[in-house]
Amino acid sequence: MSKEDAMSTGDSTESLDIDCLDDGDSEVVSSLQHLADDKLHISDNRDVAGVASKWTKHGCNSVEIDYIVDIDNNHEDPQLCATLAFDIYKHLRVAETKKRPSTDFVETIQKNIDTSMRAVLIDWLVEVTEEYRLVPETLYLTVNYIDRYLSSKVINRRKMQLLGVACLLIASKYEEICPPQVEELCYISDNTYTKDEVLKMEASVLKYLKFEMTAPTTKCFLRRFLRAAQVCHEAPVLHLEFLANYIAELSLLEYSLICYVPSLIAASSIFLAKFILKPTENPWNSTLSFYTQYKPSDLCNCAKGLHRLFLVGPGGNLRAVREKYSQHKYKFVAKKYSPPSIPAEFFEDPSSYKPD
């Protein structure tokens, strides 16, 4: 649901005086609720109470039985959408395959730009989003727009930064409460482009996107997957959260990782973050497998690619992401040590080494 839809729904809805309902009214409300559930086709798949799967923990002296924990049992917080969360993310998994860039647009479409130019642009955009304190979703959405546009439209080097500015403008209008003004974006680009040029490029991008600005990003999935990863902790584990976000943001710079869908990058980022924090423990479990819908073997190639990126960095003078997560407010996670390799047994599926 778009922000506009959410706002219009909230504006047009009046609160009910529940205290005034008599027994007859209660029956009417109950029947309406059943009717609404039927119309919405709310899935029963989210009910995981009592569902369990066996999982062998490597790196431990004893075999541990791991149960799936229901992360959608908090009905107190309306923002968690506990009743609909499972179906929402099921829909997003389908949607992410439809709003993806080409995986080889640099080789097949573009003639004047290469992967390093793309990385430099995104590194600069990381600095801009930090400078203007934009939400992370704006950055991810900006990169999504850039890559999708480059997948079809040929662009020259001079207009590469212009494309980035225009996509940032669109994404910030979609995500931010107070998006930066066009004049501000012209200023941060050292006035390389005029206001009219930015607006013209914005129109070109919107036309190409057919004004469909909603797109599932890695950040979208990361939020829910982190909830599943921290289900055994009363308070959020900030080191895990920041480290997973750092790894995910590094992936934005790496062109070779475009071949992986956002949900897979999000799941692999959590896998790698948990491994870095506790190298002797199996980072995956049945709760993560259930809510991400990925087995350890599914994560293997993506997690290894992210691990290489974590070890060597994006290269060149691309320091924005590393410097960002080297700050105290992010618990210095960019400075964390990681073992040089991930044990192969961590990528084995439960059935491959322990029968049901």
Swiss-Prot record:
InterPro entries: Cyclin (IPR039361), Cyclin-like_dom (IPR013763), Cyclin-like_sf (IPR036915), Cyclin_C-dom (IPR004367), Cyclin_N (IPR006671), Cyclins_cyclin-box (IPR048258). Transmembrane segments: none annotated. GO terms for molecular function: cyclin-dependent protein serine/threonine kinase regulator activity. One of its GO terms (cellular component) is nucleus. Signal peptide: none annotated. Keywords: Cell cycle, Cell division, Cyclin. One of its GO terms (biological process) is cell division. Belongs to the cyclin family. Cyclin AB subfamily. This is Cyclin-A1-4.
